[in-house]
UniProtKB/Swiss-Prot annotation:
Required cofactor names: Zn(2+)
Molecular functions per Gene Ontology: DNA binding; DNA-directed RNA polymerase activity; metal ion binding
Encoding gene per record: rpoC2
Keywords: DNA-directed RNA polymerase, Metal-binding, Nucleotidyltransferase, Plastid, Transcription, Transferase, Zinc
One protein family per Pfam: RNA_pol_Rpb1_4
EC number: 2.7.7.6
Subunit organization: In plastids the minimal PEP RNA polymerase catalytic core is composed of four subunits: alpha, beta, beta', and beta''. When a (nuclear-encoded) sigma factor is associated with the core the holoenzyme is formed, which can initiate transcription.
Cofactor binding comment, as recorded: Binds 1 Zn(2+) ion per subunit.
GO biological process: DNA-templated transcription
Alphabetized SUPFAM superfamilies for the sequence: beta and beta-prime subunits of DNA dependent RNA-polymerase
Annotated PANTHER family: DNA-DIRECTED RNA POLYMERASE (PTHR19376), DNA-DIRECTED RNA POLYMERASE SUBUNIT BETA (PTHR19376:SF54)
Name of the molecule in the record: DNA-directed RNA polymerase subunit beta''
Disulfide bonds: none
Length: 1058
């Protein structure tokens, strides 16, 4: 049992440590204050004293928790009082946004972004209100104690319990634009429950599958840097990186070592001094007084001159102890675990959040008005009117957004809000670049958006432009008025139609889908497609004909076909059919001439013909023949274009056909094109037939009238004749059409007819009521009392077809052309956007993995970027002729410090300088990208850990010209080894080695290690054994892994060198 006197003693120790520095008498020790307390204690006392205090604090915590008997019941889940009112206001706002969309003021993407942003703001507002209610009214609520102390859960989970769940993610990680307005306390509707299951299932799948991915990432990182530890105090490097002195870079300055003396007026800092938080504050306070030096040159891990290890000065501060790192510290293992471990933990965290979307929109810092009033600016605003997809769509009275541009020094905009009596109520000074949503003299309401600061680095941001597909919401015809609203936005209309997709049995007109009148067939393509050319229905007039049937005894391998008497017919009336007919020729064009033949003998062109049996049920209709072409698994030897020409069926055309009945089971007709023939002619008004079963012993016979042509050495079994004397008219059975409305024909250049119908629901008429200036085929928007496409204008009425107006940015990629038909949920276009999507570590881990493996990302290609930067430095080295100058590469947001520059450079010096600058700039760039992935999840990984990984991935160089050395072109060697070789070659007046930097991924760099133990135990053991055997490599056991394998003491540890 802990006594009260002991508790007082420990609290006295805390006061002695100057931790409690507040005017309040009581300080709540939550997670944040505990972190601060441990940090102060660590700086104030030794490790043993700090350990003693923290151990006793733990005992106090367990004792008080047992004594309190904390429990959580359903009564502790208090509902949020203003939730219904807030949701009603949000719905009204979203309805207004829908009106903007129908008025063609905003694009579909902006509509979607506004919905997502609005519900995200609602969720954040509810979270803030829950915090205030709990902290003020119920600070001892068990739910509040757990969430705010950091012991269990977070405020996001509390919001799902008593607030609203908000927008959920689907299995692909995208947001479902249907917010769950209920919570677990109130319950959810059936629709909300099913959407909620999306996110819950995603959490389960991610936990089951992605945890292994995070663990494997950690394993590869450890293999890359396990051999790195602190070996000496100083490597005597002369180059470093330049870090700007400002508030944004203040955290990155802490723990770095100065490369050279820094002095400016009253400030002097000696070189090799570690920058502490106190020094950072001193530099920031004197920032405005600095004349020409607004940056400071520091050492970096990327510039350390040691090959296998690091020095104390280049590494800097030990983050765990806030002191200079000790010699022997295994910093490689620490760096690998620091990057890999958050991935494992955050993967598990997505399971507990239940799939609720997290937004990358946190990069936007918004300021809202606290009162009603009028806007007044202190000085004129410098900026441009912006109307684009970059901004988050917030709408003022004039739908204008101002993008502010910084002045020569800094942007300093002060907003004043006055009431009606011109009393100042509120003022806010804005320092960052951003978007202004109000104008001078505007009347604003409480809570209205005033300004948004942009806190985005577009090069490294996950909000980079990506193509987002847009699918049509309706079926109809695409029309573009060809009138741009401005240079950024273009309008588009989709008019509602019912496109017919029916069989001939249901409707007397058939829809034939024709996408284009030619096909380009590539070499080695396998084609399996079937297109109907046309079908013929006919009505039989009074006609007599003989029907003859004969049977023959056939041998086993003999096949034959019988042909009945032909039918002679003509059309009885005009047929309402639209069809595509093979017009005269079927031509094959090749991309090059062949010497031997046009078509290979192995290519078969297959045709099919459908035969129909006549019985009682089907005798009223004859389907004579279906003309079609079929490519069945046809292997194209060379590229050619197949042209299908089109022609209409004319009235009272007369045809003669033969109807075949095959005695075999096969119904495929095979034609082999002659190698000297490049066209197949089909002529009208000629008797023609295609023989079936093109095989070895095939025999055909043809009967004309009563004539018999038989050359058959077989025994005849029986013969019978039948004659039809009566006149018959066979009519097609009538059926009710399942399509209603008015049919409209639509004809293209090649006489291909389309048929589509306008349903009664998409047409409406109204009286004119003195409306003027209305003409046929006018586009009429909403709020003109009518909206759509004017198709009829009579004396008394208008007839209007409903349509959906859309606008898209000018760089949109359209997948449909004007006057094309589009079906519902069919892809219409793709457009670039900075649309915020859900960002969790599940999307972050693959991005980090790709970067560290050297694979290209949509916005970044590591290997290409490194090569470009190296070429840039190689071409511009002639401009670096000033000693002690700062060199700034414009494409990358970092500076490299160059000391003791010599104008007369040889090839070795040029290669070293170009490699050094490109490696430093590229390393800082890719390290910042990886760091941002974790920062979006609230995990702050020390920059030096990422620099350590990148340093190893860029440590090898590729030899371009070996010079007088014994290396081989394209051989990959450590850069410091080449640097020392060049020094030796230069002293002997021999030709030096020229080389270029390369970026190898984690897997590649591990395989290229000189250590057989590391490379062999990683993967591809057989390949590693062959490589090390033939090249006779020696493993010097320099790393930790190799020594553990061979049961030797590891060359690391803070007591190893003493």
């Amino acid at each position: 049992m802990i006594k009260t006197s002991q508790i007082a003693k420990y609290i006295f120790l805390l006061k002695k440590a100057e931790f409690i520095k507040s005017e309040k008498k009581h300080v709540i020790l939550n997670k944040t204050t505990l972190k601060k307390m441990v940090f102060i204690l660590q700086n104030k006392y030794d490790e043993q004293t700090v350990f003693f205090i923290l151990e006793k604090l733990k005992e106090i915590g367990f004792h008080l928790a047992t004594q309190s008997g904390l429990s959580l019941g359903i009564d502790d889940l208090k509902s949020f009082p203003d939730k219904k009112k807030l949701i009603t206001e949000t719905r009204t706002d979203l309805n207004n946004n829908e009106e903007h969309f129908l008025l063609q003021n905003i694009s579909p993407l902006e509509k979607s972004k506004y919905l997502i942003t609005k519900w995200n703001d609602v969720n954040n507002f509810i979270i803030q209100r829950i915090k205030k209610v709990f902290l003020k009214k119920e600070p001892l609520n068990p739910l509040a104690l757990m969430a705010f102390s950091g012991a269990r859960g977070n405020i996001s989970q509390v919001s799902q319990l008593i607030g609203l769940r908000g927008l959920m993610t689907d299995p692909l990680g995208k947001l479902v634009e249907f917010p769950i307005q209920g919570n677990f306390r109130e319950g959810m509707t059936l629709t909300e429950y099913f959407i909620s299951c999306y996110g819950a299932r995603k959490g389960l799948v991610d936990t089951a599958l992605r945890t292994a991915t995070a663990g494997y990432l950690t394993r590869r990182l450890v293999y890359v840097v396990q051999h790195i530890f602190i070996s000496i105090e100083d490597c005597n490097v002369t180059n470093g990186i330049s870090v700007e002195i400002n508030e944004k870079s203040s955290n990155s300055l802490i723990g770095l070592t100065l490369l050279k003396n820094f002095y400016n007026k009253n400030i002097f800092i000696a070189k090799n001094t570690i920058i502490s938080p106190t020094l950072v504050k001193l530099l920031l306070n004197s920032y405005n007084y600095l004349s020409h030096k607004k940056s400071i040159v520091c050492r970096s891990i990327l510039t350390c001159q040691l090959q296998h290890t690091l020095c104390q000065f280049c590494y800097g501060w030990d983050n765990a102890r806030a002191k200079r790192v000790a010699i022997g510290e295994a910093i490689g293992i620490i760096a690998a675990q620091s990057i890999g471990e958050p991935g494992t933990q955050l993967t598990l965290r997505t399971f507990h959040t239940g799939g609720v979307g997290g937004f990358s929109g946190a990069n936007w810092i918004s300021y809202n008005s606290p009162f009603d009033g009028f806007i007044k600016f202190k000085k004129p605003v410098i900026g441009n009117i912006l109307r684009s997809w970059i901004v988050m769509p917030h709408y003022t009275s004039l739908n204008l957004v101002y993008k502010l541009t910084p002045s020569f020094n800094e942007l300093n905009l002060t907003l004043f809000i006055f009431d009606k009596l011109k009393n100042e109520l509120y003022n806010k000074t804005l320092k960052n670049e951003g978007l202004l949503f109000v104008r001078e003299g505007d009347f604003i309401k409480k809570g209205q958006l005033l300004f948004s600061e942009i806190n985005i680095n577009f090069k490294n941001s996950n909000l980079l432009k990506t193509y987002i597909p847009y699918y049509s919401l309706e079926t109809g015809l695409i029309i573009s008025p060809k009138l741009a609203l401005n240079k950024y936005l273009y309008p588009l209309w989709i008019f509602l139609f019912n496109i017919i997709k029916l069989n001939l049995d249901s409707l007397n007109s058939k829809k034939f889908t024709v996408y284009k009148n030619y096909s380009i067939l590539e070499k080695n393509d396998l084609i399996d497609l079937k297109t109907i050319l046309f079908e013929i229905h006919f009505i039989q007039k009074s006609k007599k004909f003989n029907l003859k049937k004969q049977e023959y005894l056939l041998y086993q391998n003999l096949k034959m076909s019988l042909c009945k008497s032909h039918y002679d017919y003509s059309t009885y009336k005009k047929l309402n059919v639209a069809f595509q007919q093979n017009n005269q020729k079927l031509n094959f064009f090749y991309n090059k001439k062949l010497k031997s033949s046009l078509v290979s003998n192995n290519i078969n062109l297959l045709w099919t013909s459908s035969s129909y049996s006549i019985n009682i049920l089907t005798k009223s209709i004859f389907n004579i023949i279906v003309f079609e072409y079929l490519y069945l698994s046809l292997l194209i030897k060379n590229k050619y274009i197949l042209w299908i020409l089109s022609k209409n069926l004319k009235k009272k055309d007369k045809f003669h056909f033969f109807k075949y009945t095959s005695t075999s089971s096969s119904k495929i007709e095979i034609f082999r094109l002659n190698s000297k023939k490049n066209s197949l002619n089909i002529r009208k008004n000629k008797l023609f037939f295609y023989s079936q079963n093109y095989k070895k012993n095939k025999v055909s016979n043809i009967l004309f009238g009563n004539s018999i042509f038989l050359k058959f050495p077989l025994k005849k079994i029986n013969t019978f004749f039948s004659q039809i004397k009566q006149k018959t008219i066979n009519l097609k059975e009538k059926k009710t059409s399942n399509v209603e409305g008015e049919f409209i024909g639509f004809q293209l250049k090649n006489n291909i007819k389309f048929w589509y119908s306008i349903s009664p629901n998409s047409l409406f008429s109204f009286k004119k009521d003195n409306k003027k200036n209305r003409y046929n085929f006018n586009f009429i928007r909403k709020n003109s009392n009518i909206s759509g496409f004017l198709v009829s204008n009579t004396i008394k009425t208008f007839t209007l077809q409903k349509g959906i107006p859309l606008i898209f940015p000018s760089d949109t990629i359209y997948h449909k052309m004007e006057k094309d038909f589009i079906f519902k949920n069919e892809l219409l276009c793709s457009f670039k956007s900075l649309k915020p999507e859900t960002q969790d570590i599940i999307q972050g881990i693959p991005r980090v993995e790709k970067l560290l493996e050297g694979r290209p990302l949509p916005f970044y290609k590591p290997k290409v970027e490194l090569y470009k930067i190296w070429q840039f430095f190689l071409k511009n080295l002639g401009f670096l002729k000033i000693k002690n100058s700062l060199f700034n590469l414009k494409k990358v947001e970092s500076k490299v410090y160059l000391n003791n520059f010599k104008p007369n450079l040889n090839i070795g010096d040029i290669c070293y300088l170009a490699y050094f600058h490109s490696k430093s700039n590229f390393g800082l760039d890719i390290a910042s990208i990886i760091s941002n992935v974790y920062l979006q999840e609230g995990v702050n990984i020390s920059f030096k850990h990422i620099e350590l990984i990148v340093r190893e991935l860029t440590s090898l160089v590729e030899i371009i010209n070996p010079g007088d050395s014994g290396f081989i072109v394209k051989e990959k060697i450590h850069w410091l080894l080449i640097y020392n070789y060049n020094k030796r070659l230069k002293s002997l007046n021999l030709k030096e080695i020229s080389y270029m930097p390369i970026f190898l991924g984690m897997t590649e760099i591990t395989k290229k290690k000189n250590s057989f133990g590391v490379a062999g135990s990683f993967q591809n053991l057989r390949e590693i054994i062959i490589d090390h055997t033939f090249t006779r490599k020696t493993d010097y056991l320099l790393g930790l892994h190799e020594n553990v394998l061979f049961n030797k003491i590891i060359p690391a540890g803070t007591g190893f060198f003493f």
